[in-house]
From Swiss-Prot:
<dbReference type="GO" id="GO:0005198">
    <property type="term" value="F:structural molecule activity"/>
</dbReference>
<dbReference type="GO" id="GO:0003774">
    <property type="term" value="F:cytoskeletal motor activity"/>
</dbReference>
<dbReference type="GO" id="GO:0071973">
    <property type="term" value="P:bacterial-type flagellum-dependent cell motility"/>
</dbReference>
<dbReference type="InterPro" id="IPR001624">
    <property type="entry name" value="FliE"/>
</dbReference>
<dbReference type="Pfam" id="PF02049">
    <property type="entry name" value="FliE"/>
</dbReference>
<protein>
    <recommendedName>
        <fullName>Flagellar hook-basal body complex protein FliE</fullName>
    </recommendedName>
</protein>
<keyword id="KW-0975">Bacterial flagellum</keyword>
<dbReference type="GO" id="GO:0009425">
    <property type="term" value="C:bacterial-type flagellum basal body"/>
</dbReference>
<comment type="similarity">
    <text>Belongs to the FliE family.</text>
</comment>
């Protein structure tokens, strides 16, 4: 549920930036000072930045992995309140969350390389 809210916030920020850039008269007419001011206003209006959202997502994946590890350790110690199915489900959730995070990282690195290889 929180991932959906994070995505919605990111989409709102992107839409606000798009509106502001079109208000400047298109890509050829953007004044750098006005663009920076518009970006600052969008940040204030739309909440956390992309980096903050990414950090929150990484922290959430870390929490899921720690919970899975803790549950597995409890099961190995013989805690009767922990069932093997719960351990397996938590382990799979942690694995899926980590795989998704790696995919996002790979896409970000690819996008960064594309931007860096653009001719000026």
């Amino acid at each position: 549920m929180s991932n959906q809210m994070d995505i919605n916030r990111l989409l709102l920020e992107m839409r606000a930036l798009k509106q502001q850039s079109s208000a400047f008269g298109g890509p050829g007419a953007i004044n750098a000072d006005r663009a920076v001011q518009g970006a600052d206003q969008a940040r204030k209006l739309n909440g956390p930045q992309f980096g903050e959202l990414l950090e929150q997502a990484v922290n959430k994946v870390n929490e899921v992995q720690q919970a899975s590890s803790s549950m597995a350790e409890s099961y190995v110690r013989g805690d009767s309140s922990v069932d093997v199915t719960d351990v397996m489900i938590a382990s799979q959730k942690a694995g899926v969350a980590f795989d998704a995070m790696v995919q996002v990282r790979n896409k970000l690195v690819e996008a960064y390389r594309d931007v860096m290889n653009m001719p000026i």
